[in-house]
A protein has these predicted regions:
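A contiguous, well-structured pocket-lining segment that forms one wall/lid of small-molecule binding clefts
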Residues: 189-270, 279-288, 294, 319-322
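Short Gly/Thr/Asp-enriched flexible loops that form oxyanion-binding sites at enzyme active sites
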Residues: 79-105, 122-123, 280-289
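Conserved phosphate-binding catalytic cores of ATP/NTP-utilizing and phosphoryl-transfer enzymes
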Residues: 1-3, 110-134, 314
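Glycine-rich phosphate-binding/hydrolytic loop that grips phosphoryl groups
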Residues: 116-117, 299-337
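N-terminal beta-alpha supersecondary unit
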Residues: 3-83, 112, 116
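Short beta-strand scaffold segments in enzyme catalytic cores
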Residues: 15-21, 136-138, 144-148
Length: 337
């Protein structure tokens, strides 16, 4: 039997990652995080690019060693071509092209957001893959999308955010509360001990299937500002309840439009993807939709945040369709879906 072995390389933001996938299954998925950004309260593009330059060679080598394969066994090299930070993308792109030349292997350009969705199609022992059509809620720091998947490579965005993404709403709310970056996971942590109904924040309801989270950020800002005028220790004394209330508002906003999309499409095979899909309440609420007769797919935590396994599985499907790139293409900070 002829195997298909893909090396995936991810460098769109602040994670340097490399993965080997063979016949749809992960042999390795190595990720190097960049903790340098924490003290700046967000990702600094120049620092991200420099860190990628330092990390990419050892990360790719580690992925190959961990997979237990030889370089000549790689059939193609898939790399993130966008969207993302252009300097960070250039590091992964340049390395992938150099490796392509040295190994004489074809290149595959991966769309970062489409790859997030395809993380659901990574094969594992005992795992059932989503049936098609598949409806996916992709939620990350920069994107919030409802995606209708007719085929793995045939994806259509039917709902998106018109301003801030859900991940931004988490991080901006966390910053207002004085929590360090990245704030989303900390809101999730403190929310575990809080009352989600203690404070009421607005749930946007713009027409159609699109989202808006900018109003929530403003509401949290004004709420905190007004409360600390009378009680300077308000945030410290009510942190768990504020976090739980903010998280409840974001997740209910996400689910309201997603359930509307389910009704409009009639699709019963559903799931989540992207970094925010690691949020405990979102996972719980999504899994509860199985009570409505849906098959619900929630990714492993390692496949939620940016990782190269999703790039490699995207490359796997592209390879099977003979969709290859070339050395002349350049990465793009913005990329049409």
């Amino acid at each position: 039997m002829q195997h298909i072995t893909i090396l995936g390389i991810e460098s769109s933001c602040d994670e340097t990652s490399a993965s080997i996938i063979r016949d749809g299954r992960v042999l390795s998925n190595f990720i190097a995080n960049q903790e340098i950004h924490e003290k700046y309260g967000g990702v600094v593009p120049e620092l991200a690019s420099r860190a990628h330059q330092s990390n990419i060679v050892p990360v790719v080598n580690s992925a190959i060693v961990q997979a237990g394969i030889q370089r000549h066994e790689i059939d193609a090299i898939a790399y993130t071509a966008g969207p993302g930070l252009i300097g960070a993308l250039m590091v992964g792109s340049s390395f992938a092209k150099g490796l392509s030349i040295s190994l004489n292997k074809p290149l595959i350009e991966a769309h970062h957001m489409k790859a997030h969705v395809l993380a659901q199609f990574i094969e594992e022992e005992g795992k059932t893959l989503p049936t098609l059509p598949f409806l996916c809620l992709t939620v990350s720091g920069g994107h919030t999308q409802i995606v209708l998947v007719e085929e793995p490579l045939n994806q259509k965005v039917i709902g998106t955010t018109i301003d801030d993404a859900a991940g931004e709403a988490f991080d901006k709310a966390a910053k207002i509360l004085g929590l360090p970056y990245p704030g989303g996971p900390l809101i999730d942590k403190y929310a575990q001990e809080g009352d989600p109904f203690k404070f009421k924040f607005p749930i946007s309801d713009i027409p159609g299937l699109d989202y808006s989270f900018s109003g929530l950020k403003t509401a949290v800002l004004y709420f905190v500002r007004d409360q600390i005028k009378t009680n300077p220790a308000f945030v410290e004394e009510n942190l768990n309840d504020i976090c739980a209330s903010v998280q409840h508002t974001i997740v209910e906003t996400l689910l309201a439009k997603f359930e509307k999309a389910m009704e409009q499409t009639g699709v019963k095979s559903i799931g989540i993807a992207g970094g925010v899909s690691a949020n405990s309440l979102l996972r719980k609420r999504m899994l509860a939709l199985s009570e409505k007769g849906c098959d619900v797919f929630v990714p492993k935590f390692e496949f939620c945040t940016d990782n190269a396994a999703m790039i490699a599985i995207y490359g796997y499907y592209m390879y099977k369709e003979n969709h290859f790139g070339d050395l002349s293409t350049t990465p793009k900070a913005r990329m049409e879906y």
